[in-house]
């Protein structure tokens, strides 16, 4: 299972993003098992809707995330937050980024992100074009 962070979902809607094509494939191909955190919905709404003013697209994308992930849309719990805080301190991450890392590790999933500086460069995630499709 590929755990897609918000950056991947947003890249799948942005034709100008360098990861548009592989992100789009991950976001829409029903043959590829994907998951997301409930946090992802807020990050998508913030990144696409609040920051870029693309409210309708943000709502549509949140619906896609929820529909595409189904039961793979994970709720953040206290244990995940505890793990996330440990990872945040260890790797100099935000609690948000660390939550994705913690969830991927808990479930044995691959974290996919376009966040080169904070996640990919630290070998905590792979880019959409490097994700191993099952």
Short names for language-model regions:
Residues 46-50, 105:
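Short glycine/serine- and small hydrophobic-enriched flexible loop segments
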Residues 33, 94, 108-110:
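Residue-level detector of anion-binding/catalytic polar loops
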Residues 1-36, 50-60, 133:
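Short, well-structured N-terminal submotif of metal-dependent ribonuclease cores
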Residues 15, 38, 59-90, 102-103:
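Acidic catalytic patch
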Residues 1, 37, 73-74, 101-134:
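Acidic, PIN/NYN-like endoribonuclease modules and their adjacent C-terminal/linker elements
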Residues 38-46:
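Short, conserved active-site loops that position catalytic residues or coordinate cofactors/metal ions
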Residues 5, 97, 115:
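Acidic active-site catalytic centers that drive phospho-/nucleotidyl reactions
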Residues 8, 40, 80, 100, ...:
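Alpha-helix capping/helix-boundary segments
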């Amino acid at each position: 299972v590929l755990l897609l962070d918000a950056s991947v979902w947003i890249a799948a809607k942005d034709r100008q993003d360098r990861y548009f094509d592989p992100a789009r494939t991950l976001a829409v191909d029903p043959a590829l098992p994907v998951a997301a955190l409930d946090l992802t919905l807020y990050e998508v709404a913030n990144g696409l809707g609040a920051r870029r003013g693309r409210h309708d697209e943000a709502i549509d994308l949140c619906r896609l995330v929820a529909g595409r992930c189904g039961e793979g849309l994970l709720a953040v719990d206290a244990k995940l937050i505890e793990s996330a805080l440990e990872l945040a301190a260890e790797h100099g991450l935000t609690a948000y980024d660390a939550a994705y890392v913690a969830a991927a590790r808990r479930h044995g999933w691959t974290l996919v992100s376009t966040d080169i500086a904070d996640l990919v460069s630290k070998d905590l995630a792979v880019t959409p074009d490097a994700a191993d499709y099952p």
